[in-house]
Amino acid sequence: MKLVRFLMKLNNETVSIELKNGTVVHGTITGVDVSMNTHLKTVKMSLKGKNPVTLDHLSLRGNNIRYYILPDSLNLETLLVEDTPRVKPKKPVAGKAVGRGRGRGRGRGRGRGR
């Protein structure tokens, strides 16, 4: 399972997130998208070396996140189970032309080198 798919299941969980600049954000996840952008509510943001700031809502860009600190009470076994079955790729059918080989009869061609 991809990490982002796991994080997308964490709706309404209270987590702490450390950013690459050292800021620690503590809040409740309202959503995570495929770019790992995370949306939080009831947020307490502790900037490095400054007093904490309380916010109603906060959106974090995914590439600014260093790591998530999950609560100990979170049941990882149930979240890590894949609920969608994988689709197996279809095998090519024998006798059908595949690729771009041997198909040189289109257009006027390149001429005779003059």
From Swiss-Prot:
CDD domains xref list: Sm_D1
Localisation: Nucleus; Nucleus speckle; Nucleus, Nucleolus
GO MF annotation terms: RNA binding
Residue ranges, annotated region (8 X 2 AA tandem repeats of G-R): 99-114
Sequence repeats mapped onto the chain: 99-100, 101-102, 103-104, 105-106, 107-108, 109-110, 111-112, 113-114
A cellular-component GO term for this protein: nuclear speck
Span list, region Disordered: 87-114
SMART domains (UniProt xref): Sm (SM00651)
InterPro entries: LSm4/Sm_D1/D3, LSM_dom_sf, Sm, Sm_D1, Sm_dom_euk/arc
Gene3D superfamilies found in the cross-reference section: 2.30.30.100
Disruption of the gene: reported phenotype: No visible phenotype. Smd1a and smd2b double mutants are embryo lethal.
Record-level GO BP terms: regulatory ncRNA-mediated post-transcriptional gene silencing; spliceosomal snRNP assembly
Keywords noted in UniProt: mRNA processing, Nucleus, Repeat, Ribonucleoprotein
Domain Sm: 2-74
UniProt superkingdom: Eukaryota
Similarity field: Belongs to the snRNP core protein family.
Function (record text): Involved in splicing regulation. Facilitates post-transcriptional gene silencing (PTGS) by limiting the degradation of transgene aberrant RNAs by the RNA quality control (RQC) machinery, thus favoring their entry into cytoplasmic siRNA bodies where they can trigger PTGS. Does not participate in the production of small RNAs.
Note: SMD1A and SMD1B have redundant activity, but consistent with their expression level, SMD1B is more important than SMD1A and either one copy of SMD1B or two copies of SMD1A is necessary for the plant to survive.
Protein name, per record: Small nuclear ribonucleoprotein SmD1a
Biological source species: Arabidopsis thaliana (Mouse-ear cress)
